[in-house]
Amino acid sequence: MTTQQQATPSGGAEWQQRPERSSLFMLRLMTWLSLRLGRGASRVVLYVIAAYFLAFAPTARRMSRDYLRRVLQLAAPAAVGWRHLFRHFLCFASVIHDRIYLLNGRFELFDIRVHNQDLIDKVVADGQGVFLLGAHLGSFEVLRAIGRQQPGLRVAMAMYEENARKINAALGAINPEAQQDIVALGHIDSMIQVHELLGQGTVVGMLGDRSLGQDDTRAFDFLGAPAELPLGPFRMAAILRRPVLFMTGLYRGGNRYDIHFEALADFSKVPPRGRTLAVQAAMARYAVLLAYYCRSAPYNWFNFFDFWHAPQPRPSRSPEKNQPTP
């Protein structure tokens, strides 16, 4: 795997500038129907949602085609057929649909299998705060389900403020009683809040595959081409001197999810002068693990934007507030 040594401003803000497709009214309606009709009957609507994206979301369709060509190792985007695209959108709709049941405590509906559980068990036993670094790959919600079932495992999420606002709104639409710890990043006291949670033994989850336009990034080989990854999550873990686990909850079809934990990095004993190299090594391993699990479950990738975009120049002034993203 190759790396670019200099920090580059990310063009990943594209995902922020898209108009919000989701409607809280529709989400509430879908939640109402799903909880009353049951998971099996309400899944019929998922085919309609997948067909809608296939027909009326050209950007998502194009990005899906580009990603699938890379992960399936096909010769050209044209080799990705409508069947591949429909399956990709259907997997996305299925995971969003299952979130309704997971947030409402309907864990008995699912077959959730945990791999390398000893890694997270050790965290709980030691009372040690740790970072969980995931991606828009599969479902993070299944981890929260495990957290509610396992005494002593408290999970919080650290994310950008706009995402935090939308997640809270979505949670309220799905289940107003759902308790969710979310730390909005980008404030002066954000790192202090994260530090306090870690000190209480909380597992703090972050997603390491998207950034804001003004964020520093590093470029790593991902599925055969350079892709920019945000430096922020890794830098925070290094500054706070905490271990980091990679986590993904892959949807395998039917009612089955596989949660995978992998040791990613341990910054607890890294001196300040060694942070740069340690962060670089952690990001390199993250890119390798992300590619590995993408190949393991190719239709679980839910980054429907140009992930392999060319770097854009850093703006000379503060960027205007971006529009929300789906």
State where each predicted segment sits.
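Non-catalytic C-terminal accessory region of glycerolipid acyltransferases
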Residues: T2-T3, L37, F53-F56, L74, ...
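Well-ordered alpha-helical segments embedded in enzymatic catalytic cores
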Residues: L29, L119, V142, S190-Q193
